[in-house]
Structure formats: structure tokens, C-alpha cells
């Protein structure tokens, strides 16, 4: 089985910049597409076999002294 890995900027090239079409293909909101619009190196997201995978950073133990 072959796996395809893409990014949202790659899909925008395929859809000629249509963010709504990318959101429809990924079954997500258009604002989610806008959030990862400039993540060309796939540091925070990846599309594997047509499924959007997102890095959920910043979660964990709340440190009271940081705020």
C-alpha cells in the first residue's frame, strides 16, 4: 500500500488557490485551511491519504508560574 503525504499549500496549487474546495476535500472548515496556509514544511500539519493530521502542541500540565 502506498501512502501519499501532502500539505495544504500543495492542495491549494491543485485547486488553483480555492480554499473552500480544499476544505471540502478534507472535510474541515475553511478557517482550518487558512490556519495552515503558510505551513509549507509540514511542521504543524500533514495530509496523509486525504486525511488531515494536525499537531496538537501546547497541551499538558498547566504551569501557573508562566502566566
From Swiss-Prot:
<dbReference type="Pfam" id="PF06322">
    <property type="entry name" value="Phage_NinH"/>
</dbReference>
<dbReference type="InterPro" id="IPR009057">
    <property type="entry name" value="Homeodomain-like_sf"/>
</dbReference>
<protein>
    <recommendedName>
        <fullName>Protein ninH</fullName>
    </recommendedName>
</protein>
<dbReference type="InterPro" id="IPR010454">
    <property type="entry name" value="Phage_NinH"/>
</dbReference>
<comment type="similarity">
    <text>Belongs to the ninH family.</text>
</comment>
